[in-house]
Amino acid sequence: MSRPAPTPIYTLRGAGGPLNTLHFSCHGGDTPLLYSASGKGAIHIWNLNTRRAERIVEGHSGNSIIWVSTLQAAHTLISQGRDMQVCLWDLSEGRSEVVDSVWTGSVGFCQCSVLETSPGNQLLAFAGQQTEEIKIIELPSKTPVCTLVPDAKVGMVMCIKLWQPDSGPGPLLLAGYEDGSLLLWDVTQRSELSRAKAHPEPVMCLTFDPERLRGISGSSEKTLSSWMLDRQNNLQLQDDVTLVNAGVSQLCIRGDGKLLASAGWDHRVRVFGWKKLKPLAVLQYHTDMVLSVAFSDHQDPRQRLLAAGSKDQRVSLWSIYNEGADTG
């Protein structure tokens, strides 16, 4: 007998707008939290024990918020809005105030990427005012580090990912562009290391596994493209995954490197084994495009969750493949 189709263990309602981005914070303190940000400029901080919004933070002048994250420094939230601002929030002791902001000048949908370089210090990468440029600054000082502009015409920057390699200097940055290209940048040298043409359409999203030096990207078409870095930091295209329906908003790899989730324009979340890209499950609940997916960072593997946020203004939470299942 085939397994019954999975259902959400619960859903969160009341966000009041399309759910563009999700971020878990479950490893510190007693209360596991999920941050969601909407197209109406609201950030909901959901208490996963009570399954209710503990707090609602309004920002970015009501403009759509496209990215949220937390910094290691306690109670510091960072958000990016379509008002061309990145805001740093102090959420300690019941506060919800913007303590600093960065003007990006970008009107696109490219989400920022943040990398902790030392305790209390981060690098922040974001799409700049010019179509193809990526700017990187240090936080909290806001000192400019570099501006990365490709030599060839690749169109608008669509998605970026900062990461720190285990060996050699760093950090490095992966970027997907409007013409379907992926570029790997050396931030320190401000130079392009390699490129690959991963898609015929714009790269809508990418995610990267620094331990395995392997990544995957999606676009508006029916194909996910997987790729890897060799020892010389050359991008090498690997297998493609053909989807039933076109369009992927976001991709996410679980922290243990076993699962990959995709947010589909067809209202579905698809789950694959990350090792061999074996299809494992199709999660059907939402009534509109799924815009975001995130795996929780619980320390206990049995508590791990997958969250999906949709244009239908709901967040679904799922518990899947937590007990050593063969994910392939």
Regions found by a protein language model. Give the residues of each.
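Conserved strand-to-loop turn within each blade of WD40 beta-propeller repeats
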Residues: 37-40, 80-83, 127-131, 176-179, ...
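Beta-strand-rich domains and repeat architectures in extracellular enzymes and scaffolds
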Residues: 11-41
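A structural motif specific to WD40 beta-propellers
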Residues: 7-9, 52-55, 97-100, 145-146, ...
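WD40-repeat beta-propellers
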Residues: 43-47, 86-91, 134-138, 182-186, ...
